[in-house]
Each structure stands twice: as structure tokens, then as C-alpha cells.
Amino acid sequence: MHAEAPAATGSGATGADAIFGHVLVGIDGTPESLVAAAQGGVVRAPDGHLELLAVAERHLAAQAGFAAALADDALVADTAAELAQAAELVDADAARMTSGNLVKLLCDECSRRGATLIAIGVRPHRRLSALTFGGHDVEALHDTRCSLLIARPGWGPHKPDRIVVSVDGSPEAHAAEVVGRSLGARLGCDVVPVVSLVGEVDAGVLRKEREDALLDPRPLVEAVVGASSRGCLIVVGRGRQRGHRWRGTFVERIVYSARCSVLVVQQEPSAPA
């Protein structure tokens, strides 16, 4: 592991593995950060780059009032300690620590350095409380422009028990399935595509080559979550219209209903004609 990130990075990862070519892990001084680091190391492409970015959010220390100075010291120390533990847990290509807002800095680094996947730990809360009170996970869901791994305890540094993919016939779901199947083949995991039978089912999702699909009479969110366990990885696709900030209610419902980690595969918008 290097003490400081180089000016630029690159990876030979291609095809479905390309999103695992440059993994950027957010470290914020919480145990969930270590889970994100471990799982980021598992999914990283064989010739991929993994970077640990620790961020001490020192502005939070001001909430301690007269004890702000002590709180600031403790916050910085905790973040540095988590970075050191993460560096021992995963073979990172680069690691560094800074201060500011974790998600903003991750997004800036993603744009500046071409990261293909951000990994961040999620604390145990539900969607309503996350949307009401905020948090790094919900900020990352709204603000990141690359693929995102929302990490929960259950696997890592070992592979997930199986990979569960949300399938609905959309381009985003197709991209997620391609990535999920490729990752499953590389890690040696079973892949379970889940198809909801609620409403009009796209005939394309029932094609012959998807004989391993799990057909479920429940709505897709419930079906996907029901097919997963704590040791699984759910893979779901998302899209973003040009000029609009993404707000994926469907993906949020998956993320906050699931008991396991969720990989959100970013499907870039088509170029205008």
C-alpha cells in the first residue's frame, strides 16, 4: 500500500469487469467503512486499482460546543485508526486521509481520477430515517455519478453466498444482469435473476437462456429482497437522464429494504441524436 495516491490511475479491466477497474472506498471512522473496504477488495477486477480515501469530517466537532477541540482530536484519531485498519484488511494500491465532506470528496475524486465504483458502508437504518436525517449512504445514492457499492456486514473479505439480480426488461436491468453474471463467474458465485410476475411481464425477460430466473408473484422490490439473505449481494441497475439529478425511488427501496450489500450499476444515458 502506498501512503499517497498517484496523480492518475488506470486499469486494463474491460467489458462487464470495467466497473470494478478503479474502486474508491470511503473511510469515515466507523466500522462500516471496514466492511466497504473488505467488499471493495473482493469485487475489484484482477488488474484493478483500489484506493482508500479517509475523510475526517471535522465540521461535526463543532456540535460538541466547549469540547469541540477535544472532539476534533478524537474524530481525526478515529478516522486515522480506521484507515490503518482498512489498509491492513485489504491490499490497497493507494491510501490517504483528508478532511471535509466524505461524499462530496468521493464524488470529486470519482470525476477527477476516473473512479468506476465507489464503495461506502451503510449504517443500520431504514429508508425514511435515512431520507429524513441524511447520512453518507443516502447522499451517495443521490450524488454519485458512477456505480456504487452500499456495503453491509455479511461477506468480505470472502465472496458473497450468491448474487441476486433485479430483472425487469429495462436497459438498466440488462446492464446490471451482465455485470452480476460476470462477477458471479469470476468469484464462483451462483447468480439468481429475479423476475416479478406483477403486471405485464416483458417477454424478453423470460427468454430461454434465462432458465435460472426466479419468478416471483410479489412486486419486484419484495421479490428481490425476499430472494436475498445477509450473505448475498444484490445487483440493481439505475439510469440518469441528461441534465437531471438522479433520484431512484426503486433503487432506494431495494437498498433500505435489503439485509445485505447492494451494488448499484450506473447505466449512462444515451448520447443525444
In which residue ranges do the predicted regions lie?
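Short beta-strand elements of ligand-binding domains
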Residues: 119-122, 147-153, 262-266
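Helix-enriched interaction subdomains in cytosolic or periplasmic regions
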Residues: 1-7, 15-19, 110-146
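Small/aliphatic-rich secondary-structure junction motif
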Residues: 15-69, 92-94, 159-214, 226-233, ...
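A short acidic, glycine-rich active-site loop
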Residues: 69-81
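Glycine-rich, Arg-bearing micro-motifs that act as flexible, cationic patches
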Residues: 20, 120-139, 160, 236-257, ...
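Charged docking surfaces used in two-component/phosphorelay signaling
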Residues: 96-105, 214-222
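Active-site phosphate/pyrophosphate- and oxyanion-stabilizing loops and adjacent acidic/basic residues
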Residues: 38, 84, 107, 138, ...
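CheY-like receiver
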Residues: 105, 109, 113, 223-227
